[in-house]
């Protein structure tokens, strides 16, 4: 089922003609209709809904009621609308579903009108235009999923969870999202719309996909499951540097690095309970008669290590870290999108044991700042992402100053999602979300304070009196999945490209940092000498020794976003200098090679290094994409 929900000043319709041979019988009174101050729900019932119409009705009513509460609507207009899908259900099934939705909404106390089914209708609608005024929902019955495999927490959330959305300013003002003035905060507006609509389906290819293919970084792998990618040498270099960078930052912060298995037993008592808190989207592996699932995070392995460890209050906060290569999650095929949403991904995952809420909140703030620092290092500033903070109403009342301080640290308004009661294992969570060129958002950094899993897994520490206590646990990924960081970097550069600016990777991440171009074969030896000096200084350099004309060689380097282009001819060889084109500012300068080495070293100081991923000479390189 597809639904388009519009909060409107009014919706009115008038029947014009039959759209089906046997439409729903109607009276003269039903040929026209109008409701004011209404939530208009345009619905396409789909073929897949025929598998379990009753389930679809229940889910649809829950979604409609959720939105109605958010926009404070007491009137609902159910409007059959075939144009939201190309895979429609049989007319008799669709009509029955629509009637039951109408009936159940009336039972809940709403004033409901339903437009006739099977007719062409003229309609007028006045949308209110606030951030919650236009939302979409997709509902799919869980055909073939046995009762015991269904996700307990997810079912509960669908029935009971109601989110209240606000914008919190750095000054501490909490404003209902539909009353906030988004002027000057267009990216936040896009994020709010995406977050509330919950539409994860990718209907177009995001620009980063074109860039990852053009630059021969990453590609789809037809020999594997969808959402499992292949990395060419340049892409593997970028990914490897990011993995090393985040790991170094987390270890520097004080985490102990561990390694744990990628698969776990479905029947392990603690894991079975934990799985019930997550959607049933695991890869399943069988070994003999036993069934295992591939991990979707490092939680399992780290929790089991902590369970077996003897931990004193003197050891707290205790930070443990693993870079999972890989974590797995069987996302729906329609949600898969380049590097943004995958089925196999690399997740930097730190878990911190804290003795009490005070220590946990202190760590939370430190890890919030750590996440900002990590993203800044990959070229993403607070202007490039939006913040969401999630908690219960009680937590807000008890910790307002702490939450406001988070908004002050980031220096701009943030999205707040608040609940009346806690449905999840955490009491506080934040994410830094990147909004891409298709107005889709993806969570990067995140930290959560977990109040359930210590007891669930039997993780304890000994306090000052020698008594065993259950700690709190913080889940932290300071960057988010490495693939998503690559996605965000490429999408940011695509935005700059669309604005007529020169895109480029951060210098420390550029697969080739310097390209040396000899004007002729006569100076190839000097070009190789220059390249040797740069390589000796741990700078990634290559030499264009192809037969292309000089202008074409320069254009080729520009197209590859090479930060420094050195053109060498007889003058440079005789004077032992280099002529350098800087991509960053577009300037061309003549300088000593030592000065260029010093400049690059200064700009890459503090970041990891890996050697050139491809042969030195361009003529020796294979082409990975036709």
From Swiss-Prot:
Positions of region (Catalytic): 207-506
GO molecular function terms listed in the Swiss-Prot or TrEMBL record: ATP binding; threonine-tRNA ligase activity; tRNA binding; zinc ion binding
Stretches the record annotates as Editing domain: 1-144
Enzyme class of the recorded protein, top EC level: ligase
Residues that hold Zn(2+) according to the record: 299, 351, 475
Catalyzed reactions: tRNA(Thr) + L-threonine + ATP = L-threonyl-tRNA(Thr) + AMP + diphosphate + H(+)
Cofactor note: Binds 1 zinc ion per subunit.
Cofactor(s) this protein cannot do without: Zn(2+)
Subcellular location: Cytoplasm
UniProt EC number: 6.1.1.3
One GO process term, biological-process aspect: threonyl-tRNA aminoacylation
Keywords: Aminoacyl-tRNA synthetase, ATP-binding, Cytoplasm, Ligase, Metal-binding, Nucleotide-binding, Protein biosynthesis, RNA-binding, tRNA-binding, Zinc
InterPro entries cross-referenced by the UniProt entry: aa-tRNA-synt_IIb, aa-tRNA-synth_II, aa-tRNA-synth_II/BPL/LPL, Anticodon-bd, Anticodon-bd_dom_sf, DTD-like_sf, Thr-tRNA-ligase_IIa, Threonyl-tRNA_syn_edit_dom_arc
Pfam families in the record: HGTP_anticodon, tRNA-synt_2b, tRNA-Thr_ED
GO cellular component: cytoplasm
Domain of life: Archaea
Principal place of residence: cytoplasm
Domain observations: The N-terminal domain is an archaea-specific tRNA-editing domain that hydrolyzes incorrectly charged L-seryl-tRNA(Thr). Catalysis of tRNA editing is performed by the charged tRNA itself.
Subunit structure, interactors included: Homodimer.
PANTHER family: THREONINE--TRNA LIGASE, CHLOROPLASTIC_MITOCHONDRIAL 2, THREONINE-TRNA LIGASE
Family statement drawn from the similarity comment of this UniProt entry: Belongs to the class-II aminoacyl-tRNA synthetase family.
Task performed by this protein: Catalyzes the attachment of threonine to tRNA(Thr) in a two-step reaction: L-threonine is first activated by ATP to form Thr-AMP and then transferred to the acceptor end of tRNA(Thr). Also edits incorrectly charged L-seryl-tRNA(Thr).
Protein name: Threonine--tRNA ligase
């Amino acid at each position: 089922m597809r639904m388009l929900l519009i909060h409107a000043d009014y919706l009115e319709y008038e029947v014009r003609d039959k759209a089906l041979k046997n439409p729903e019988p109607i009276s003269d009174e039903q040929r026209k209709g109008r409701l004011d101050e209404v939530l208009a729900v345009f619905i396409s019932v789909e073929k897949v809904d025929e598998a379990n119409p009753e389930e679809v009705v229940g889910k649809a009513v829950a979604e409609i009621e959720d939105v109605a509460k958010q926009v404070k609507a007491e009137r609902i207009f159910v409007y059959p609308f075939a144009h939201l899908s190309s895979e429609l259900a049989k007319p008799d099934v669709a009509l029955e579903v629509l009637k039951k939705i109408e009936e159940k909404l009336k039972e809940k106390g709403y004033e409901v009108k339903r437009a006739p089914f099977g007719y062409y209708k003229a309609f007028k609608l006045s949308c209110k235009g606030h951030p919650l005024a236009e939302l979409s929902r997709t509902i799919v019955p869980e055909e073939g999923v046995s009762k015991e495999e269904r996700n307990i927490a997810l079912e509960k959330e669908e029935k009971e969870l109601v989110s209240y959305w606000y914008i919190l300013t750095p000054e501490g003002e909490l404003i209902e999202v539909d009353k906030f003035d988004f002027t000057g905060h267009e990216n936040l507006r896009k994020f709010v719309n995406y977050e509330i609509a919950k539409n994860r389906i990718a209907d177009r290819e995001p620009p980063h996909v074109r860039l990852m293919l053009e630059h021969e970084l990453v590609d789809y792998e037809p020999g594997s499951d969808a959402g499992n990618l292949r990395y060419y040498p340049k892409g593997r270099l970028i990914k490897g540097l990011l993995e090393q960078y985040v790991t170094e930052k987390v270890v520097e912060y004080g985490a102990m690095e561990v390694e744990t298995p990628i698969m776990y037993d479905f029947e392990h008592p603690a894991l079975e309970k934990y799985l019930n808190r997550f959607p049933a989207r695991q890869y399943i592996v069988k070994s003999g008669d036993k069934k295992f699932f591939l991990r979707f995070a490092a939680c399992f392995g780290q929790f089991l290590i902590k369970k077996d460890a003897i931990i004193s209050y003197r050891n707290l906060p205790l930070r443990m870290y693993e870079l999972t290569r890989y974590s797995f999650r069987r996302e729906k095929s329609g949600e898969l999108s380049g590097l943004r949403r995958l089925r196999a991904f690399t997740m930097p995952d730190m878990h911190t044991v804290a003795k009490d809420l005070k220590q946990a909140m202190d760590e939370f703030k430190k890890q919030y700042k750590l996440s900002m620092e990590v993203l800044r290092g990959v070229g993403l500033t607070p202007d490039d992402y939006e913040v969401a903070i999630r908690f219960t109403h009680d937590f807000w009342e008890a910790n307002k100053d702490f939450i406001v301080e988070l908004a002050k640290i980031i220096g701009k308004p943030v999205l707040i999602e608040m609940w009346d009661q806690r449905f999840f294992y955490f009491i506080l969570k934040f994410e830094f979300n990147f909004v891409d060129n298709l107005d889709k958002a993806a969570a990067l950094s995140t930290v959560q304070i977990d109040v359930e899993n210590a007891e669930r897994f039997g993780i304890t520490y000994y306090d000052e009196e020698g008594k065993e206590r259950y700690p709190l646990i913080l889940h932290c990924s300071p960057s988010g999945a490495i693939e998503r960081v690559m996605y965000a970097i490429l999408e940011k550069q695509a935005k700059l490209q669309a604005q007529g600016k020169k895109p480029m990777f951060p210098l420390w991440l550029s697969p080739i940092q310097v390209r040396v171009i000899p004007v002729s074969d006569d100076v190839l030896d000097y070009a190789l000498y220059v390249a040797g000096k740069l390589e000796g200084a741990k700078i990634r350099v290559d030499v264009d020794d192809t037969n292309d004309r000089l202008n074409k060689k320069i254009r080729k380097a520009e197209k590859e976003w090479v930060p420094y282009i050195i053109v060498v001819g007889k003058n440079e060889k005789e004077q032992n200098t280099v002529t350098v084109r800087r991509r960053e500012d577009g300037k061309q300068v003549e300088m000593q090679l030592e000065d260029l080495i010093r400049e690059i070293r200064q700009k890459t100081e503090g970041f990891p290094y890996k050697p050139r991923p491809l042969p030195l000479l361009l003529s020796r390189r294979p082409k990975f994409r036709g």
